[in-house]
Amino acid sequence: MLTFWHWKWLGIKNTEFKCVKGKLYLSPIKDLFNNEIIAYDLVRSPNSEQITQMMKQAVARLAGAKPILHSDQGWQYQMIGYQNILRENGI
């Protein structure tokens, strides 16, 4: 059963994987309390839509929780769409 008390701190970091047929980009959100993956998206080319989809998954799963989200300052996290999702959901 999921509980809100451990969703106080979440971490986010894009990771590039080199594969036989090219690169893959993983964008997960991890609960820093128990290392559970809250949401993720995997794409062949990094783009702002990847971050938007991952954040929509996270918001649906958090169901009203308002955690603190740690991320680097990469270009994906500077996009207005990403920042709007955070603002609209009190994250």
From Swiss-Prot:
<dbReference type="GO" id="GO:0015074">
    <property type="term" value="P:DNA integration"/>
</dbReference>
<dbReference type="GO" id="GO:0003676">
    <property type="term" value="F:nucleic acid binding"/>
</dbReference>
<dbReference type="InterPro" id="IPR012337">
    <property type="entry name" value="RNaseH-like_sf"/>
</dbReference>
<dbReference type="InterPro" id="IPR036397">
    <property type="entry name" value="RNaseH_sf"/>
</dbReference>
<dbReference type="Pfam" id="PF00665">
    <property type="entry name" value="rve"/>
</dbReference>
<protein>
    <recommendedName>
        <fullName>Uncharacterized protein HI_1280</fullName>
    </recommendedName>
</protein>
<feature type="domain" description="Integrase catalytic">
    <location>
        <begin position="1"/>
        <end position="91"/>
    </location>
</feature>
<dbReference type="InterPro" id="IPR001584">
    <property type="entry name" value="Integrase_cat-core"/>
</dbReference>
